[in-house]
Amino acid sequence: MILMDIKKLFGYEGKTVVVSGAYSGMGLAAARLLHELGAQVYTICRRNGRHSKLDFPAAGELYADFGAKEDIDALADALPEKIDAMFLCHGIALKADASNALEVQKVNFLGHKYLLEKALPKIADNGSVNIIASTGGYGWQDAFADCAAVVNAPSYEAALDWYAAHPDVIRNGYVFSKQCLCAYVKMKVHAPEYIDRKIRLNAINPGNTITGLTDDFNRNTSPNGDAAEGKAVIEAIFLDSWNGRWATAEEMGYPLAAIGSDIFSYMSGQIIYFDYGMSSVWETDALDAAIE
């Protein structure tokens, strides 16, 4: 039996890809694998590389604060003229007092939406857009009306106006931002700008994963800002029932790279949970409750 050429199977050799959040965690894992598979990897760093270094040679390093519209404008202009696959892996955590709720919306969702509106013409026909959302976005269907309002906002400023008019909705910042990402994938998969050029659009919803944000999540989960206390709360909710463990960044970044590849050339509009089945338990528990 002749073994398949793995690089040819993925189809990244000589292709141009862009990865945000590429300097740590899941984004770094995805970017590193994409490089190993032969892609020309352009990375986006929020801190302009001052505090982060890659462990592989990038084709180009770009900067953008995804909470700043002017940065995204500049980034869209600086991106390569042809992009075969885009991987949006960046995000921030909500503070315990929700004081950064608006910033979370801008970085975790609105920045994605605005960049894609600006940069989609550069994405090649039959290319892919691949997003890291979160299991925190579970139940997005229940928030669909609010999510759709932001997804359908006709401009960046209109979305900001909506946020300003709905402070109670965005106060749970992280959850709503990830719900919006899920809604975006479902709403846009057959939008003309995607389907007419056969650009695939998918997202993954990671479960509890050890990344650069883990300490932030732990501290912000605790009313006292205590990381150990917050970690215990998170594990009690998500891991203890099945004696589970935290995932590694590679267990999320590698599947993301695969989803954007030729292997998944017929998959689009999907939100894939990588949570060791927790979302399935929630779904069946809800169905059982409805029967009762």
Predicted regions mapped to residue ranges:
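C-terminal substrate-recognition "lid" of short-chain dehydrogenase/reductases
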Residues: 245-274, 279-280
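Short, small/polar-rich loop/turn modules that mediate ligand/substrate recognition or access, typified
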Residues: 195, 200, 267-269
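N-terminal Rossmann NAD(P)H-binding glycine-rich loop of SDR-like oxidoreductase domains
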Residues: 23, 31
